[in-house]
């Protein structure tokens, strides 16, 4: 008996409601926390522009942040819970994305949405395809087989994303914060 029959387009059917729930959460349930100064404030942006990142501390943090969800999803992908795990992952990712973007817009307005875009580039151009391949396998297995090419691609894409997030993204976000500090 098939409980879930999902295709590639249906992945968005779980991500988008999660995203909308994140927006609703920020606007209604977490509204009292939005008034507090946080990372989406002009003060934080001005401090970030002058901050130096310790690469030796940041690299292990990034590896944990990016590899742990990937490895957990990969481990579950070989069990009967793979479709449920993929759906929960998509809902959770959508929810956290909605919370993040809404919080940024609430705190900084248009600058906040642009900051979110800057914070995702360029590493998410590699993370997204890696996770989509793994999620697609979770959704379409056992009809789809995992192979060496998928493994190599996912590992290479994640490694490239981590390198870009470590070296390129901080400078991109710093340039963004300097640009908006000059215009303020």
Where are these regions (language model features)?
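N-terminal signal-anchor transmembrane alpha helix
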Residues: 2-35
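Alpha-helical transmembrane segments of multipass membrane proteins
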Residues: 18-26, 69, 127-130, 157, ...
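Perimembrane loop-to-helix junctions flanking transmembrane segments
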Residues: 36-56, 182
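Interfacial helix-start motif at the membrane-water boundary
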Residues: 48-75
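Cytoplasmic juxtamembrane regions at transmembrane-helix boundaries
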Residues: 76-98, 147-159
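Hydrophobic alpha-helical transmembrane segments of integral membrane proteins
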Residues: 92-122, 166-170
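Alpha-helical transmembrane segments of helical membrane proteins, especially in multi-pass transport
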Residues: 93, 116-140
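Terminal transmembrane helical module of multi-pass membrane proteins
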Residues: 133-184
């Amino acid at each position: 008996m098939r409980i879930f029959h999902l295709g590639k387009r249906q992945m968005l059917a779980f991500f988008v409601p999660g995203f909308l729930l994140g927006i609703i959460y920020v606007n209604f349930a977490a509204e009292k926390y939005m008034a507090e100064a946080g990372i989406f404030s002009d003060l934080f942006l001005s401090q970030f522009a002058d901050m130096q990142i310790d690469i030796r501390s940041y690299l292990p943090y990034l590896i944990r942040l990016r590899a742990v969800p990937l490895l957990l999803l990969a481990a579950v992908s070989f069990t009967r819970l793979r479709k449920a795990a993929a759906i929960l992952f998509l809902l959770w990712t959508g929810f956290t994305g909605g919370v993040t973007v809404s919080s940024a817009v609430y705190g900084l307005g248009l600058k906040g949405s642009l900051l979110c875009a800057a914070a995702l580039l360029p590493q998410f151009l590699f993370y997204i395809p890696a996770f989509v391949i793994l999620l697609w396998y979770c959704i379409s297995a056992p009809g789809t087989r995992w192979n060496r090419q998928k493994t190599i691609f996912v590992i290479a894409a994640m490694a490239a994303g981590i390198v870009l997030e470590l070296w390129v993204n901080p400078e991109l976000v710093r340039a963004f914060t300097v640009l908006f500090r000059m215009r303020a």
